[in-house]
Swiss-Prot record:
GO terms for cellular component: external side of plasma membrane. It is found in: Cell membrane. The keyword Protein biosynthesis does not apply. The keyword Repeat applies. It comes from Canis lupus familiaris (Dog). GO terms for biological process: antibody-dependent cellular cytotoxicity; cell surface receptor signaling pathway. The gene is FCGR3A. Residues 1-20 form the signal peptide. Residues 228-249 are cytoplasmic. This is Low affinity immunoglobulin gamma Fc region receptor III-A. Forms a heterooligomeric complex with ITAM-containing signaling subunits FCER1G. Interacts (via transmembrane domain) with signaling subunits; this interaction is a prerequisite for receptor complex expression on the cell surface and intracellular signal transduction. Binds the Fc region of antigen-complexed IgG.
Amino acid sequence: MWQLVSSTALLLLVSAGTQAADVPKAVVVLEPKWNRVLTMDSVTLKCQGDHLLRDNYTWLHNGRPISNQISTYIIKNASIKNSGEYRCQTDQSKLSDPVQLEVHTGWLLLQVPRLVFQEGELIQLKCHSWKNTPVRNVQYFQNGRGKKFFYNNSEYHIPAATSEHNGSYFCRGIIGKKNESSEAVNIIIQGSSLPSTSLLLSHWPQIPFSLVMALLFAVDTGLYFAVQRDLRSSMGNLKNSKVIWSQGS
């Protein structure tokens, strides 16, 4: 009886754990994908997550609610005050991880999707100009050395990142008759030998589930062998027992 109650309790624990794990996080997506923009740029943030047709969306900027209840939040003319951390949530999903938006001033800005990459990943760099003003003779630099030159402004792609791509990057180009340069950004390349923290965290609900299932299997297996042992013992006692007949019976 105790084993049956324990198995039932464990099954209820598994059910509750899987239901909690089934609620996904919402995700904030930037369009365009760059999280570093210039003043007057337009930026669209999209909240992706499980939702019903009439669900409301909750947006937070630096922890404060935004009066926006739809899936997209549009910044038409970005200013410094739009910089900061953005998060979103739907009625059917948990609060998203934060996405950082940086609004800068200047003629040129080196844009990159993020500053930390894993070995083997694609790195995309863009020399972005204020109000998309035409730029020519664009050159990308790493640690002060020229790496790529374009007569017309183009993105610079590094197909597979290695440790050699660690360092400080900036771009330079001619706008009108002036030679302009962007501020430098530091890019870090991490080794790929160990899984990332986010990858480990994404699988954490499966770990206790696996342990509980293994425990259930062990309990059931133990009960099976215990019953088999008792049956063999009973059969053996029956065979070895002597039956005494009395004439009067």
